[in-house]
């Protein structure tokens, strides 16, 4: 057996049905749709439930999207242990080190984990627990 002699298993491949090509084809005239009725005449729109009140209209509208919402990139204290003692941690440094993918509206430092290094952290926002943990480790926080 050679690569050019390979053939699909018998019955595994079937010919495409060509509907509406004359009565003698077996799939002509109504093309397998039966006679008359809603399903024979055309397609119903997306979400149509046969005249019943559709689900998307039964469920009430809720909320809105605030166009002024600010989304901050989040950094936890545990990930700041990656830096050396006395380092000034800035948003640019966080981007270069791969801790933050994109800056969005800025950076927010949260207090999850334990900080063991003395760092100066510059960010747009800090949680209260993050500020106390950074200062307890001998570091400083600066709001940008």
Curated annotation (Swiss-Prot):
UniProt keyword annotation of Metal-binding present: no
GO BP terms, alphabetized: translation
GO cellular component: cytosolic large ribosomal subunit
Gene from which the chain derives: rplO
Region feature (Disordered): 1-51
Any Pfam family matching the protein: Ribosomal_L27A
Role of this protein: Binds to the 23S rRNA.
Protein name: Large ribosomal subunit protein uL15
Keywords in alphabetical order: Ribonucleoprotein, Ribosomal protein, RNA-binding, rRNA-binding
Stated family: Belongs to the universal ribosomal protein uL15 family.
Quaternary structure annotation from Swiss-Prot or TrEMBL: Part of the 50S ribosomal subunit.
GO molecular function, a single term: structural constituent of ribosome
Keyword Ribonucleoprotein: yes
Stretches with biased composition (Gly residues): 23-35
InterPro entries noted in UniProt: Ribosomal_uL15 (IPR030878), Ribosomal_uL15/eL18 (IPR021131), Ribosomal_uL15/eL18_sf (IPR036227), Ribosomal_uL15_bac-type (IPR005749), Ribosomal_uL15_CS (IPR001196)
